[in-house]
């Protein structure tokens, strides 16, 4: 008999905080030295986790009274091609080593995704610790993170903007509202609620700064969050609503050239920045970032936008999902007039794919043509071409790690 069948599965409460914290600390090896380096004391990190248990759904597996595995889902909103989706960000996925291999995590994931299905959350995302493991459970890569280093002499010098930059406090209202505006116009971006902002700042040092770019009408149009340490400017995040704000922030970075030797930063636009600067001989490293999974295909398609210029298409998509049975069948979909609906009308084409492939396709990370070339989609090539015609193709911007 599988020992996992004798364990108890339930949602955590605030009384479970000590065990929740201990499991996180052990699994992710957060040491006292690391806490001290970022200004945290053990009792403070425990206290800061109260909102997680209060506002997120944390499902745990107990061996007797002992918490041995957990799976947390943060409720968030996400921009998918300008449609706002209620999604779940899966995090704090961890199990004590002696309990691995018993199917505990798979069972927790099924229960967690089933609860999302009941709550109307049709999409889930996470930052993976093991891409092969999540592949096996129907997840797929949906975004990239590009890290880059720029030497002081390579910082753009021929940029200027008519506005100005001001440093503001971490809790500045304009700063938070600016991110909300950015999220509303950026495919893939998450809307940060109070809990997401708390997690955003959790490990930052006290010397971390926020600089906001304002245009000549005093309207905030961009910001950067950064720390200067050991002659390096570490930029945690830089977003902008337009080219003017982007230039204004680079001008602000250049103003620090006498204080720093290098700039280290990341971009989540999946577009290398070397082309944008005069001296593009820089080091850039690309790696997969977020993974995603459609929780409920039928519900996801209800609000899914498509290209109104792609014409009308009626197609059968045969989806394989070994984890969630309500997704494991054929969906007949009509794409027309910028939207899609399930239909009983005769289908022109038929394609077959797994739930992970469908997820990365509809999020825009890969085209149907590329997935077909990789043998991730089965069917006729003309069907693949028509499907690409009706879909938008833009890689999601996902920068949050919760």
Label each PLM-derived region with a short phrase:
Residues 1-75, 82, 89, 155-195, ...:
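Short amphipathic alpha-helix that is part of the acyltransferase structural core
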Residues 109, 114-128, 258-268:
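Conserved GNAT acetyl-CoA-binding A-motif
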Residues 99-111, 244-248:
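Conserved acetyl-CoA pyrophosphate-binding loop and the N-cap/start of the following alpha-helix
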């Amino acid at each position: 008999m599988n020992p996992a069948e004798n364990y108890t599965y339930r949602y955590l409460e605030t009384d479970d905080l000590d065990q929740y914290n201990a499991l996180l600390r052990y699994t992710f090896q957060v040491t006292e030295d690391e806490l001290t380096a970022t200004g945290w004391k053990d009792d403070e990190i425990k206290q800061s986790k109260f909102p997680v248990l209060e506002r997120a759904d944390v499902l745990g597996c107990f061996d007797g009274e002992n918490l041995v595995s957990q799976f947390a889902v943060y409720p968030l909103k996400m921009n998918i091609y300008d449609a706002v989706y209620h999604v779940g960000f899966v995090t704090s996925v961890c199990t004590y080593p002696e309990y691995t291999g018993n199917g505990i995590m798979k069972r927790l994931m099924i229960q967690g995704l089933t609860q999302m299905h009941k709550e109307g959350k049709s999409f889930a995302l996470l930052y993976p610790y093991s891409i092969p493991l999540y592949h096996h459970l129907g997840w797929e890569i949906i975004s990239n993170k590009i890290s880059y280093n720029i030497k002081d002499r390579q910082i753009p010098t021929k940029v200027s903007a008519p506005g100005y930059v001001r440093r503001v406090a971490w809790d500045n209202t304009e700063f938070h509202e600016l991110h909300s505006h950015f999220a509303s116009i950026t495919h893939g971006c998450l809307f940060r609620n109070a809990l997401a902002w708390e997690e955003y700042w959790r490990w930052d040092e006290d010397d971390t700064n926020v600089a906001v770019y304002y245009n000549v009408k005093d309207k905030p149009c961009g910001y950067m969050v950064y720390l200067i340490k050991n002659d390096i400017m570490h930029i945690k995040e830089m977003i902008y609503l337009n080219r003017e704000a982007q230039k204004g922030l680079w001008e602000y970075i250049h103003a620090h050239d006498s204080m720093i030797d290098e700039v280290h930063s990341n971009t989540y636009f999946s577009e290398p920045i070397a082309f944008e600067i005069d001296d593009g001989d820089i080091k850039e490293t690309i790696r997969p970032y977020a993974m995603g999974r459609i929780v409920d295909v039928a519900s996801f398609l209800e609000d899914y936008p498509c290209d109104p210029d792609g014409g009308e298409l009626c197609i059968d998509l045969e989806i394989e999902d070994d984890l969630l049975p309500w997704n494991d069948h054929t969906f007949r979909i009509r794409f027309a007039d910028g939207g899609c609906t399930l239909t009983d009308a005769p289908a022109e084409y038929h394609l077959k794919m797994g739930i992970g492939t469908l997820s990365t396709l509809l999020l825009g990370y890969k085209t149907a043509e590329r997935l077909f070339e990789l043998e991730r989609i089965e069917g006729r090539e003309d069907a693949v071409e028509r499907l690409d015609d009706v879909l938008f193709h833009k890689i999601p911007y996902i920068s949050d790690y919760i």
